[in-house]
Amino acid sequence: MKKRYFAIPILAIALHFLLSNLLYFLVERLVLDVFHIPSQQFMKHSYWGEILIYAVLILVFFTLYKLLWRKEISEPRTATNFKDVLGSLVVGFGICGISGLWIMLAEQLPSLQKSVEAMNAGTENIAGGNAFGTFMIAVIAAPVVEEILFRGIVLRSMRKFTPAWAAILISSVLFGVYHLNIVQAVYAAFMGIAAGILYEKKRNLLFPILVHFANNLITMLQGFAPSEVNELISIFILIMIAPAGYVVCRSLRQGKRADSM
């Protein structure tokens, strides 16, 4: 039985990689070869194809998530409530503040400067730089798909054969590595740890999704906002680091009290 759970994380990540690339290829061929839409026009509105792809991915992985854990529906789960929703957003904002400090450090290290440039270029190219497309893809769709995959499937499968701390750490490292950029991998892994702790303690996917949502929302705003607004955003997310740490530590303490009962 444990061998089955050992294989699930590897297979799920591989499925996401293969399916997303296959869907991108099919959409591109459909638009260019079947509908004969000019490539320049396709690139301008390519975010609609990406939104469609993410909709399919959400459907596939949410269905897989439900099928995997259908027999554990009675497992204790924290109901959605305002306090934990707000706490999850605070954690996301705080993680973004820590990410900002890490990126500032990485920019000063010659060995990481190319990774920073590649990461920034990739962020700018999301949805062709379209604000609506970026919001729908990076802020809404990506957090849903990635949290279902890495917290709902990968982390939860690992909990069947490893202790909580190991499952959270390993799934977070895999989440970081999956971004294929060393600078992005570090802060993605850090966010994964915070999201993993909330999921482990609450067993409600909404909370890590909100962490991811808040983090990506700030990143998007920083990409589109004027420099004056960016300065205010930077101050805000730095201030949020301490409250974020408090929320995560409180979740850990609550978990210990529950475990001792």
Cite the ranges covered by each PLM segment.
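Interfacial transmembrane-helix boundary/kink motif in multi-pass membrane proteins
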Residues: 1-18, 44-48, 69-101, 160, ...
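Hydrophobic alpha-helical transmembrane segments
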Residues: 6-14, 48-57, 85-90, 125-145, 232-237, ...
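Alpha-helical transmembrane segments in multi-pass membrane proteins
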Residues: 14-68
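Functionally important transmembrane alpha-helices
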Residues: 17, 21-29, 172, 177, ...
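Juxtamembrane helix-loop-helix connectors linking adjacent transmembrane helices
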Residues: 37-45, 72-142, 160
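Membrane-interface capping segments at transmembrane-helix boundaries
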Residues: 66-73, 247-261
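Membrane-interface helix/loop boundary segments of multi-pass membrane proteins
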Residues: 145-170, 197-204
